[in-house]
């Protein structure tokens, strides 16, 4: 007769219970992190994982470069534009009546019937099929804007709608778009009134001379564009696209390659516009940093910002700085742009920051950036194709080592032929970043957005929530009254809260 073994039975029950308890002790974030580690050597599965991952905000996105060439072709065809076949530069009509290869100025719509012509446009207006050696990535990249620029003039609303659709597909919650709103009007006014080295005189001259009209023009442009976005996306209707849920704000984009009187006029327009319209949350200075005028006038531009920041201290500033590499400019040109952008230009965020280790006292600067919580907008694909900076040559690991906050960004995703998902993929594969690393970058993007209001986070090292919402963050349940009151008081916190809810939904799949 077989004897029973109650002790063995109890041991099995105990072990089963312990295993279940251990499994339940693993957090959803840990399970999700394990999944990423398990598929890390399978790029297609990693890509699928990252495609669905919530990514927070894209803080460095130029509207003019965000549109894919295929959409630009459509815009140009709608406007009956022509192409200089030799240079691939758009021209106003009338176009040649023929689409033959002999036509020097064919209509852009000829591309719909000629695949070779269509592909020529895409390659000329983007980095597609660009190869190192024939033309530098830097030169090809920046040349695209003068080629397709005419196509964007009348399609701001449609372009914004396209960007938001891409953002929604990438599971972004927020986008800050750089755009020169009413910029031509203020630049022309600056040229008309002329230059004075006395910034106070310049400001009064511009304000009394009609600069407020440029601000009004910019706001009207946003009104028109916003109406088109709502219509194209079906926002507020039963057929609304997911892009309607992406929050968009704008940075006034100053063209720093212009003469000083025009740059000052645009900077002043940016400060005035951001002070008057909540849709515009700050300003930035753009155009290639290594070009002659931006290099010559760099500190002059910083002094302009310093002066106007004193008058408009609430207006946020993000600056392109350190989008440089050895050989592109003389060594001394690499040595101060990031520091001066922060200390003189009052930048709260730095775009690119690739040349940080070429700065004077680079390690001291890194510690200062960490202490002051100056976020760096990391544009991996852009830095590769423009500067050839990638892998170990890129300072992303250095920024992370020194505790400088970082967030991934697309820069000009249409020209680069990339998107935010592939920025995350490049970061994960190149630097072996964990799910938690990527998650915290997404959180940092919203923490350092220029949205108004208090942060959801009391601590951005471990991401502990403020007291009112501390218990709510870890529970995927109805928000407590205290937390809801806090969220109602802050647009920034509401956007961060939405990201946390989307993280919870994403992690529940694993």
Predicted regions span which residues?
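Bacterial N-terminal signal peptides that target proteins for export
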Residues: 1-10
């Amino acid at each position: 007769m077989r004897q029973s073994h109650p002790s063995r039975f109890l041991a099995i029950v105990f072990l089963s219970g312990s295993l279940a308890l251990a499994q339940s002790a693993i957090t959803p974030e840990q399970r999700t992190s394990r999944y990423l580690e398990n598929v890390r050597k399978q790029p297609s599965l990693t890509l699928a994982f990252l495609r669905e991952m919530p990514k927070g905000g894209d803080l460095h996105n130029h509207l003019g470069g965000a549109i894919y060439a295929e959409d630009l072709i459509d815009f140009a065809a709608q406007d009956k534009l022509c192409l200089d076949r030799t240079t691939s530069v758009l021209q106003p009509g009338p176009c040649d009546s023929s689409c033959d290869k002999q036509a020097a100025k064919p209509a852009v719509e000829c591309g719909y019937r000629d695949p070779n012509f269509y592909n020529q446009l895409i390659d000329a207006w983007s980095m597609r099929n660009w190869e190192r050696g024939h033309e530098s990535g830097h030169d090809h990249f920046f040349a695209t804007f003068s080629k397709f620029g005419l196509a964007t003039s009348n399609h701001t609303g449609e372009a914004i709608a396209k960007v938001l659709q891409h953002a929604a597909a990438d599971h972004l919650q927020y986008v800050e778009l750089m755009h020169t709103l009413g910029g031509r009007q203020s630049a022309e006014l600056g040229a008309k009134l002329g230059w004075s080295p006395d910034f106070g005189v310049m400001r009064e001259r511009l304000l009394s001379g009609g600069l407020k009209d440029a601000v009004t023009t910019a706001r009207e442009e946003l009104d028109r564009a916003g109406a088109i976005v709502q219509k194209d996306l079906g926002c507020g209707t039963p057929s609304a696209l997911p892009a309607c849920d992406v929050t968009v704000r704008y940075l006034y984009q100053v063209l720093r390659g212009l003469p000083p009187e025009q740059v000052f006029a645009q900077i002043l327009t940016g400060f005035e516009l951001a002070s008057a319209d909540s849709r515009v949350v700050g300003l930035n200075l753009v155009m290639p940093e290594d070009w002659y005028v931006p290099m010559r006038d760099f500190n002059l531009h910083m002094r302009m910002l310093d002066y106007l920041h004193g008058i408009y201290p609430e207006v946020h500033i993000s600056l392109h700085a350190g989008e440089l590499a050895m050989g592109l400019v003389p060594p001394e040109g690499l040595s101060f742009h990031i520091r001066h952008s922060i200390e003189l230009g009052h930048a709260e965020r730095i775009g690119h920051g690739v040349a940080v280790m070429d700065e004077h006292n680079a390690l001291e600067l890194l510690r200062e950036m960490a202490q002051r919580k100056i976020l760096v907008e990391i544009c991996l694909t852009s830095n590769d194709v423009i500067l050839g900076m990638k892998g170990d040559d890129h300072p992303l690991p250095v920024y992370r080592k020194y505790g400088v906050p970082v967030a991934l960004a697309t820069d000009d995703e249409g020209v680069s032929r990339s998107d935010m998902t592939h920025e995350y993929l490049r970061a994960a594969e190149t630097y072996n970043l964990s799910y938690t690393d990527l998650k915290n970058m997404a959180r940092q993007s919203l923490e350092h957005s220029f949205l108004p209001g208090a942060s959801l986070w009391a601590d951005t090292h471990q991401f502990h929530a403020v007291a009112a919402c501390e218990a709510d963050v870890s529970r995927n349940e109805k928000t407590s009254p205290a937390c809801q009151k806090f969220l109602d008081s802050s647009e920034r916190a509401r956007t961060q809260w939405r990201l946390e809810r989307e993280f919870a939904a994403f992690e529940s799949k694993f």
